[in-house]
Amino acid sequence: RPGRSTATVERTDLVASESLDAKLGPRDPVDLAFAKPGTITGLSAVGSVIDRGGVLGEVDGRPIVLLLGDRPLWRTLTADPVGADGQPVDQLTGADVRVLEENLQALGFITDTSDAKVDDTFTGSTGEAVKAWQKSLGLPQTGVVEPSDVVVRESPIRIVSRSARVGMTSGGNVLSVAATDTVVTIELAAKRVSLVSVG
C-alpha cells in the first residue's frame, strides 16, 4: 500500500495592492476675520507661522492674539460678571473659560503653585493670571477678556495672504490662513476607491 503524501495548509489574508501617485502639500487656506471693530493698525507678515500666544495683527493698536482650543470665546470673561440689568451674577463657568485657562497655563501664567486653576470657573485668581498675560502684551491690566481680543484655532497657523491692509476698517476678512501640518492628496478613480480606507 503506497504511503500518502501530506502538505500543510496555511491560511492567509488575500491582499490587493497598487501603487498610486500622491502629492504632499499644505492644507487649503481659510479666511480669518478680526471681530474687534476699529482700524487695522498691524498685520502679521505673509508666510509667518503663528503659534499659541502669537499676535495675528492689531486693531486700534491692540494686538489680536491667537489661542489654541476647540471652542471660541463667546462672551466677556471676567471675575466680576454682571447681568443684563447691571447687577452682579454668579461666577462664569463653561467651556470658553476652560479654553482661556488652558491657554494661560500653556503660556506659563497658570502654574502648579498659582491660585488660579484650570477648572472651568473664572475666579479672581483667573483674573490675576489674565492681568499678568495682559502685562506681557503691553495692554492695560484689566483682568477682562473680550471675545474680539483673540482668535481661537485648533492648531498653529501659517499666514497665506492678506485680505486687508493697514489703515482699513476691520470687520471683513483680514487674513487667509492654513494649518501648518501637511496633507497627502491622491487622485483616485471611482473603481479604485475600494483599495483605500480611512486612516
Regions of interest found by a model, annotated:
Residues 122-164:
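Short beta-strand-centered interaction patches in the first periplasmic/extracellular domains
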Residues 81-140:
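A short amphipathic alpha-helical interaction element
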Residues 5-11, 16-52, 56-57, 65-89, ...:
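Short beta-strand segments of a lipoyl-like beta-sandwich/carrier module
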